[in-house]
Amino acid sequence: DYGPDKRLYITLNQTYTHAILLNCPIVPTISVPPERVLGLAFEPIPYLRLSYDFIHFAEKHVGLYYIGHIHPNLTGAFFKEHHGFMWHVPHPQIPPTLEEKYYKSDANQRNKISIIVSNKMKAPGNAYRHKLATFILINNLPIDIWGNGTEMYSKRFPNHKNIKGLFKDSEPYESYTLSICIENYRHPHYFSEKITNCLVYNAT
């Protein structure tokens, strides 16, 4: 039921009947009534950066905006404390089973657990992941570390086999039976692609 002549069709031009706002801290131009406008957040409040201009705009032009956590400044009844939207890595046609991962993985891969660290340190979860990565490397735990945050560890722990470095897509999930997920912030009704990526590849 999707297509230019069907009930549902996503258009790039100015002819549309409904609108979906993803995060959208910048005030958009909407030409449909508020009951046809839906907002979906996929970032926690500290990352959304919703301006007062957007909040005033949303009060008049947005029917519902699903957000993970309602900040005290978000007094409009259209803001709903509920998980909004989250993307994930492209999923395989047939997700590998845990048995396949455990018994048929690359013979060169000795570890079955992964963790991803970025080069960011600002959020509580960022800092905690770096503390955990340091502990893993100091104690030589059987956990592989991925992400752009591994560069600092490559200098401190040269030639450490657990440091895998950058990844393109699904490498930290597809051949692992477990992956450590730590969110940047703790908020009701919020979780990120850190969890959905693991679920897609059965790395729970």
Sequence positions of predicted segments:
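Nucleotide-sugar donor-binding catalytic core of glycosyltransferases
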Residues: 1-204
